[in-house]
UniProtKB/Swiss-Prot annotation:
Its main location: membrane. It comes from Homo sapiens. The lineage of its organism: Eukaryota, Metazoa, Chordata, Craniata, Vertebrata. This is Mas-related G-protein coupled receptor member F. It is found in: Cell membrane. GO terms for biological process: G protein-coupled receptor signaling pathway.
Length: 343
């Protein structure tokens, strides 16, 4: 999550340092890990341009998602989650783009170091927020599919907004704690608190968030298979959520392997830092493509407005009165409500 500079392990200091920059510890280079005694070759210079191009494409795509989901498409509980996901991705991609510009131009000095520090904090916070939103939207979608009647009657009107706000606050709190223990307390001497924070973040992401997003997705997969056997069209919204979780799991493999090998077996990370950063950037840039592919109508040969495509991606495929007048699920009922009543 940090800049693409060469790494040198300083004696007596667990934090990786960037030579030629300031003496502040380079803490967020591998996502959130501060690995001891890792000496890595600098990434190829072309990687900075690849990062910059990828971030700019992702910023354009997520910017369109912010515009359409925020101002053009009628809101429903799941579009609110996607809106906050796009906001987190924009923040992370922006911080990574600034890093790429600074590294490409070779900017040095106190001000450049300050911008890098701000981008590290911003990137970590946005990354944690985006990861924590995926289990929330997966669990809510699973509840709306498996228990539609109970879910619609019991669900608070503003549940999506409240959950997103809480996740933003928790991500900011965890980021501040990590910054405090690993930057302010780690300037003088290496501290065990920073290592504990790294372990805590790994447990939070890989042992808590990942299972919480995978289990609801397994339930959605079973639901999709049951509908396929009954020759019913599956919900596009299910495909969107399954695709987003799959992209995250695939893109986080390298980061997870690095963390697991080091903290469990004390084996140095096998992958270069820029590989894990590139995978995270791909994950943040891929969501607009997922919305587009899920929402496009293959039977339409002519060009369709993006608003129509994105709105179609939110459909859940349920028909009112399906299965002998069964209760419609959340998204169908929300889309029929006036715009001011969506939560």
């Amino acid at each position: 999550m940090a800049g693409n500079c060469s790494w040198e392990a300083h004696p007596g200091n667990r934090n990786k340092m960037c030579p030629g920059l300031s003496e502040a510890p380079e803490l967020y280079s591998r996502g959130f890990l501060t690995i001891e005694q890792i000496a890595m070759l600098p990434p190829p210079a072309v990687m900075n341009y690849i990062f910059l191009l990828l971030c700019l494409c992702g910023l354009v795509g997520n910017g369109l998602v912010l515009w359409f989901f925020g101002f053009s498409i009628k809101r429903n509980p799941f579009s609110i989650y996607f809106l906050h996901l796009a906001s987190a991705d924009v923040g992370y991609l922006f911080s990574k783009a600034v890093f790429s510009i600074l590294n490409t131009g070779g900017f040095l000095g106190t001000f450049a170091d300050y911008i890098r520090s701000v981008c590290r904090v911003l990137g970590l916070c946005m990354f944690l927020t985006g990861v924590s939103l995926l289990p929330a939207v997966s669990a809510e979608r699973c509840a709306s599919v498996i228990f539609p009647a109970w879910y619609w009657r019991r669900r608070p009107k503003r549940l999506s907004a409240v959950v997103c706000a809480l996740l933003w606050v928790l991500s900011l709190l965890v980021t501040c704690l990590h910054n405090y223990f690993c930057v302010f307390l780690g300037r003088g001497a290496p501290g065990a608190a920073c290592r504990h924070m790294d372990i805590f973040l790994g447990i939070l992401l890989f042992l808590l968030c990942c299972p919480l997003m995978v289990l609801p997705c397994l339930a959605l997969i079973l639901h999709v298979e049951c509908r396929a056997r009954r020759r019913q069209r599956s919900a596009k919204l299910n495909h969107v959520i399954l695709a987003m979780v799959s992209v995250f799991l695939v893109s986080s493999i390298y980061l997870g392997i690095d963390w697991f090998l080091f903290w469990v077996f004390q084996i140095p990370a096998p992958f270069p830092e820029y590989v894990t950063d590139l995978c995270i950037c791909i994950n943040s840039s891929a969501k607009p493509i997922v919305y587009f592919l899920a929402g496009r109508d293959k039977s339409q040969r002519l060009w369709e407005p993006l608003r129509v495509v994105f709105q179609r991606a939110l459909r859940d495929g349920a028909e009112l009165g399906e299965a002998g007048g069964s209760t419609p699920n959340t998204v169908t009922m929300e889309m029929q409500c006036p715009p001011g009543n969506a939560s």
